[in-house]
Structures are given as C-alpha cells and as structure tokens.
Amino acid sequence: MVMAELQKRGVPYAKLDLASVDPFNLPVSGETIWACGIKQDGVQFELLKALELENHVINSTDAIATCASKVTTTAKIIRSGAPSPATCFTNSKEIVQKFIDTHGGKAVYKPVYGFDGNGIYMFHSADEIKEEPPYYVQEYVKNDRDFRIFVIDYEAVGAIKRQSAHLTHNIHQGGTGCAVEIPKDMADAAESAARAIGIDYCGVDLLPLETGGYTVLEVNGTPNWHCMTAPIPKLLADYLVKQDKEDRR
C-alpha cells in the first residue's frame, strides 16, 4: 500500500530483497531504504547495518533492535521519564517473588523477545514460572482494553482500541479493534515513548490507568496498521519522500 502511494506521486523506487543481497557488492549509496517487513533475525540486521553506512535506513537497525527487546525498550522508556508499568528483570525467582509481593500479589510474565502477545501470562507465585531465566515481569495493570497508537516522526497519527476477554488484547490473539480519536494525554504518552526509542515510525501500545492517563506497554518497530482508519500508507509515503529529499540536500 505504501508502494502504491509512491507510485501515485511518480516517485521512483526499487525493491531490495535482503534474502539475496550482498552489501559489499551492491551499488547502493545515498539512498533512503525503508526496512518494511523485516524479519527480526541476525542476518537481516547485519545486512541493514552494513547498508546504513552509506544509506538512510528507516527504521534504523538500532531502533528495530531496541524494540525487539522488551528489556532495552523498557530501560529507555523509564530513563526518559515516559510512563511505564513497574518492571523486574532478573535471574532470581526470589527477586521475582519480592516483586509480586510488592505489587498486589500478582504480576505478568513476558518473553523478552516475544511478539503478537505470544507467551504472556499472569501469575501469583514465582514458582508458577515454567520458563528458564532470565525473567521479565511487570506489574499487572487492571484493564479491559489497550490502545495501539501509530506514530510517525514523533507525531501520533492514528489509533485503535483493542479488546478481548483475555489478558492480552492483540488482534493476533483474537482481540477486536476499532479506530478511536487520540486525546492529548494519549498522544503525549505515545510520542514520548517514540522519542525515548529514537524511532522514525512505530506502533506504541498503551494501557489506560484507573487514575487517568496511560502507561506504555511496548513499542513495535515494525508495526502493521490493522483496523486503522487514518491513511497510514499515505502518511508513511509522505514521510519517506520528505526524508529522502532532506537526505539529498
């Protein structure tokens, strides 16, 4: 869809297949490369890192790598002052248990490198964790929905509300989504998270707080735009064209 928007503008582009690229023998320099649909594996990261030396890759490999790790994402969000649930990352079940006892007798386990809501569950005792360490756990924030905010160039441009009968509300986990307006406090939370990561565009997942405002669950560096009514492909195409023009000045 983004490619179709570029075609409408008469913007020339070429597809780059990372499965068959040798970055040391590729005559590509001074270009804008949109890393769409990237698989989060070491080979593609290394290819893009090599290409970044002579080109502008969007999103950057550093940003994508940060978003792939819940630990690094959370560390940057907390350091920036953006809202985040209380979090524990440790090899020790004893420390996990102390965290649970301090945060209402339950917590949420999440795989460090998980995606689409896979492998996430609530537990009440550290002994319930079956996975090997390290353990990444967060306080449980009572909710019946979450929000995915699409951010481009540090501006919230689209949002959906996701709901399900389960702990996670991801569309891939059976959740349903509908487009919603973006109030200022929602935009502020999403935009501050994007700035904390330093990412061109992203999907920021937020939970509403009973006391008001929102907290940042995670930042997705390769987001889709399921259920969005905002013209995300058009806005992304506009951003890519703008960045390319700025890079060529």
Regions found by a protein language model. Give the residues of each.
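Rossmann-like NAD(P)H-binding beta-loop-alpha module
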Residues: 84-107
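A short linear hydrophobic-aromatic micro-motif
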Residues: 86, 106-109, 135-137, 201-204
